[in-house]
């Protein structure tokens, strides 16, 4: 409990979970009403709960534009997922192929920016629901249920938006950062984009999972496919997929065994089981930020209870589930490590560079423009948080006791963790700079602050060049210029002293990063091309 309070000191995650549960319960009530009035099968209710549970989490970062997009994308995806579920039952090969294409495509479109990434996330939600309904549960309602699935998905978006809006207006949850803050614009990179690599990895993992699952467990292949998807889908790097695979296997095993121990306690169609399912989903949503293992354990327990609710004994399927989970995790891990792998070091270097770019924007911004300064500060904080997510696997691996590996010469790379710690220590001075820039006596006009800003900005740029292994522009010798008169600096006000101290602290932390990345490569100085400066041996011939 003490660790839990540390990970959620202001209970912000718990508050967001409460909003998510309200979204789930409202959508659940609507789906029950539609099921009764339209004569649909209970699988429509399961799909509605799965979509609303996932949407309640991903929509935390949505702004107004994202919600308008969700009103179009999610209903269409829900209708497509409903038809795909029937296709998989009647034409498995074609259905499996379309499922793989849909999942891989939702990852591939991330290359088109933030909006496309969030739209791709919405596409995944109904496809995930296809894997949740227990095998052998026939879908009812014909094509009519496709339209009702779209209506229910639209209700989930509208209801979730209203609940979230009310929670934000009352201060129950934080407002998400603007798109201008979370958008990462960087130079075009050569090679295969990360989104394409991840899409191919996911496609290979899902294809292998379908083949193995259908051949080994024809009635319960979904466990293998679902695990392969969960391990591969959000993996940022090889280290991330390794940790996720381990947590998924461990957590799912614990969840399956716990659910198996209570199997039969509620009976088919038990209302008590429904209450337990929603309670466990709430705990899973809250503790996911603490560890993915809690999420995996709780969600697997929910799926086991769902099988029990449908009358399929979870105790009889214990070994099948554990085997399917282990195989799915292994397939996801193998695909991420062998198919165009994304190195963890490359991810951490790239995210460090984007964080430094945001810091440079703050240092070079017009301090008379308070909005621009605050936006640059928000981008820096957000990108440091993204770096923290990328280094989570390294932090865990560094904490593991691996004496035999160390005897063989392997040591965990703690460099990215030191870089993250240094950038996090910069957040305090950055906040003080924002306060100083908003003061009535703006220190931007003070020559001492201007010199310090220029020096720190140059330090930041040098680090970015070192990370990208790009040489600095060669220095061209120039004729000496006569010294210019420098206007004397005024008295040091409290604001100026605070700004100078903050810049000095940032520069000191940048020295820590220089120790990790080194100096940028140097380019040979170039001399202005004059006829007399060209050696005789290399002058062009008249022949």
PLM feature spans:
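Long, hydrophobic alpha-helical segments that serve as membrane-spanning/inserting helices
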Residues: 1-39, 59, 110-114, 141-153, ...
């Amino acid at each position: 409990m003490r660790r839990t309070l540390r990970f959620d000191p202001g209970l912000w995650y718990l508050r967001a979970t409460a909003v998510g549960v309200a979204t789930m319960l409202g959508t659940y009530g609507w789906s029950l009403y539609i099921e009764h009035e339209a004569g649909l099968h209970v699988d429509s209710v399961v799909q509605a709960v799965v979509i609303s549970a996932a949407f309640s989490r991903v929509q935390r970062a949505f702004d107004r534009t994202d919600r308008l997009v969700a009103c179009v994308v999610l209903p269409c995806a829900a209708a497509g997922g409903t038809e795909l579920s029937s296709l998989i039952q009647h034409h498995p090969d074609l259905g499996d192929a379309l499922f793989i294409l849909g999942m891989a495509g939702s990852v591939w479109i991330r290359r088109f920016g933030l909006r496309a990434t969030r739209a791709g996330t919405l596409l995944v939600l109904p496809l995930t629901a296809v894997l949740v309904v227990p095998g052998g549960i026939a879908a009812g309602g014909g094509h009519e249920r496709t339209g009702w699935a779209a209506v229910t998905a639209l209700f989930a978006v509208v209801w979730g938006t209203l609940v979230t809006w009310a929670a934000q207006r009352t201060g129950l949850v934080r407002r998400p950062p603007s798109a201008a803050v979370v958008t990462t614009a960087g130079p075009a990179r050569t090679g295969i984009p990360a989104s394409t690599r991840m899409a191919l990895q996911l496609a290979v993992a899902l294809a292998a999972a379908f083949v193995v699952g259908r051949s080994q467990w024809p009635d319960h292949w979904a466990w293998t496919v679902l695990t392969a998807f969960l391990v591969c889908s959000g993996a940022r790097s090889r280290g991330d997929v390794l940790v996720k695979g381990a947590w998924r296997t461990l957590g799912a095993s614990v969840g399956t065994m716990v659910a198996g121990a209570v199997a039969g306690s509620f009976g088919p169609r038990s209302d008590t089981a429904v209450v337990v399912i929603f309670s466990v989903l709430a705990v899973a949503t809250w503790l996911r930020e603490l560890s993915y293992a809690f999420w995996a354990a709780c969600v697997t327990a929910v799926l086991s209870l769902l099988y029990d609710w449908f009358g399929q004994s979870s105790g009889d399927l214990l070994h099948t589930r554990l085997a399917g989970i282990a195989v799915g995790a292994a397939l996801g891990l193998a695909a991420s490590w062998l198919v165009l792998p994304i190195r963890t070091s490359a991810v951490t270097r790239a995210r460090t560079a984007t964080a430094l770019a945001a810091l440079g924007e703050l240092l070079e911004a017009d301090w008379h423009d308070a909005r621009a300064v605050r936006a640059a500060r928000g981008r820096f904080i957000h990108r440091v948080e993204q770096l923290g997510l990328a280094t989570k696997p390294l932090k865990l691996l560094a904490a593991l006791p691996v004496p035999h590996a160390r005897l063989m010469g392997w040591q965990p790379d703690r460099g990215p963790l030191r870089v993250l710690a240094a950038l996090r220590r910069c957040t305090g001075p950055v906040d003080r700079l924002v306060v100083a820039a908003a003061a009535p006596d703006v220190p931007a006009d003070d020559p001492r602050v201007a010199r310090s800003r220029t020096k720190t900005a140059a330090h930041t740029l040098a680090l970015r060049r070192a990370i990208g292994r790009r040489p600095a522009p060669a220095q061209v010798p120039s004729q000496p210029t006569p010294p210019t008169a420098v206007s004397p600096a005024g008295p040091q006000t409290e604001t100026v002293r605070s700004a100078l101290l903050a810049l000095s602290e940032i520069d000191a932390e940048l020295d820590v990063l220089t120790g990790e990345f080194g100096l940028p490569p140097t380019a040979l100085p170039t001399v202005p091309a004059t006829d007399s400066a060209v050696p005789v041996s290399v002058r062009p011939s008249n022949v």
